[in-house]
Design a protein with these regions (language model features):
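C-terminal motif of bacterial Sec signal peptides marking the signal peptidase cleavage site
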Residues: 14-17
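Bacterial signal peptide processing site
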Residues: 19-22
C-alpha cells in the first residue's frame, strides 16, 4: 500500500511538473529593469537610450498582441519630458490614462504640471 501511494504521488508530481507555465497578461520586456535602474542608479544610461529600449519593447508588445504593463506609458512619458519632448510626453500620459482609468487622477495632475 505504501509503495502504491508513493508511486501515485510521484506520478502526480510528474504531471504537475509538466504543466505549461502560465502566460503573462503583459509584455514586460525590459520595463522593470529600466525602472529599477532609473531609481537605483540615476544617470547611468542616457534618457534617449532608455526611450529607445522602451519604444522597442512597445513595438514587440504590439507585434505579439500583448498589452504593456501599467505605468509603462507614464514612465515613457516621463522620459520624453526629461528629453524635452513635451508633446510626446503628453500623448504618453494620455495613453496611460486611457488604458488604465484607475490612474486618471494621477495622470491629470501630471498633465496639469506639464502645461505650466
Amino acid at each position: 500500500m505504501r509503495i502504491q501511494n508513493t508511486l501515485c504521488a510521484l506520478l502526480l508530481l510528474t504531471l504537475v511538473g509538466c504543466a505549461a507555465p502560465k502566460q503573462s497578461l503583459y509584455q514586460w520586456g525590459d520595463y522593470e529593469n529600466q525602472v529599477y535602474s532609473l531609481y537605483n542608479d540615476p544617470g547611468k544610461s542616457p534618457v534617449e537610450a532608455q526611450i529607445e529600449k522602451l519604444e522597442a519593447d512597445y513595438q514587440k508588445a504590439r507585434s505579439t498582441n500583448k498589452a504593456v504593463p501599467p505605468g509603462f506609458h507614464a514612465h515613457l512619458g516621463y522620459l520624453y519630458f526629461q528629453a524635452g519632448k513635451g508633446d510626446q510626453a503628453v500623448q504618453s500620459f494620455q495613453t496611460e490614462k486611457a488604458l488604465f482609468p484607475e490612474s486618471a487622477i494621477y495622470m491629470d495632475r501630471i498633465l496639469d504640471k506639464t502645461k505650466k
